[in-house]
Amino acid sequence: MTKILIVATSNAGKLREMQAYLANTDWELTLKPTELEVEETGDTFASNACLKASEVAKATGNWAIADDSGLQVDALNGLPGVYSARYGKTDGERISRLLKELGSEVNRQAQFVCVVAIASPDGAIALQAEGICRGEILHAPLGSGGFGYDPIFYVPEKQLTFAEMTPELKKSVSHRGKAFAALLPKMAAMLSSSAE
């Protein structure tokens, strides 16, 4: 039986990635109503993901899934962090600001973090998972795929930026991919226990 899962985002890129991660499940993903805005007031990725999932679930009366993710740059004391999406108006502005702030800094170590949360229709958080991908910030963008900071986030083990990776490769190594890999077994267990 297919269950509706409201995705607490208006970001079409995130929706497509989530649909790919959950393709072989009994969940049908749909975007949240555009007029439903949830302000990200949390100071951690986990608190923001839980807040968004809970608010959207309560407002729609459906199960809801949310993620909060961002880039933490070691030399910038973890910034942009939870402010990653608000570091500029466009992807280009965000990348430019980050590269300007890093300047000629030698330590380019960084990590992408993703926390995914699922809330039941009453707003209670049913599941939560985290994924982390370590990498480095390049001095200039490379690649045309992906979105956000993907063109400047380089994964040394793969010798590619996120923007140079195929969707399949990115899915297997990214912070979001790792979070969903941790979440899927929990979702399957939850569905089987609720079916009993």
Swiss-Prot record:
Cleavable signal peptide: none
Catalytic activity: XTP + H2O = XMP + diphosphate + H(+); dITP + H2O = dIMP + diphosphate + H(+); ITP + H2O = IMP + diphosphate + H(+)
GO molecular function, a single term: XTP diphosphatase activity
Keywords: Hydrolase, Magnesium, Metal-binding, Nucleotide metabolism, Nucleotide-binding
Bound cofactor: record note: Binds 1 Mg(2+) ion per subunit.
An individual GO BP term: nucleotide metabolic process
Disulfide bridge positions per record: none
Active site: D68 (proton acceptor)
Function: Pyrophosphatase that catalyzes the hydrolysis of nucleoside triphosphates to their monophosphate derivatives, with a high preference for the non-canonical purine nucleotides XTP (xanthosine triphosphate), dITP (deoxyinosine triphosphate) and ITP. Seems to function as a house-cleaning enzyme that removes non-canonical purine nucleotides from the nucleotide pool, thus preventing their incorporation into DNA/RNA and avoiding chromosomal lesions.
Subunit structure, interactors included: Homodimer.
Protein name as catalogued: dITP/XTP pyrophosphatase
Taxonomy of the source species: Bacteria, Bacillati, Cyanobacteriota, Cyanophyceae, Nostocales
